[in-house]
């Protein structure tokens, strides 16, 4: 009986030591309701320039997200410049605040309307060759790792209403609709 008790105590001590030196890694798997693919179409003012975003964002359970969208800039009533964007980053939710960090962004100009004249992507290629300069893209003006904060105002399963905290002007709302 004494030998059995010593064996149990020895095994318990061994398990305790192993647990101390080899702790279980924290679970990085997220289960928030935002996981999935969402569509949105919204616009906001950044100090005189109207920005419009129309696209999809996919949030994954590993805390990563991807965004694919058309992003248009309208600095005045006669000019609109549209870019196709593809970005990737990380997301986290704290209480009712969604925080995203954009780690990588690629964009390409797809269309420009100036005083009724439409320039398409092939026209941009020609402009680059003629000017011997690359046309500026959104990532030329965006800091890598830039973060954005959103207040979750409505948290329904298929529709989310976010208030974007806009450091360059008034806050604005974004409605997201679940695609899958």
Predicted regions and their residues:
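Lipid interaction determinants
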Residues: 2-86, 94, 99-180
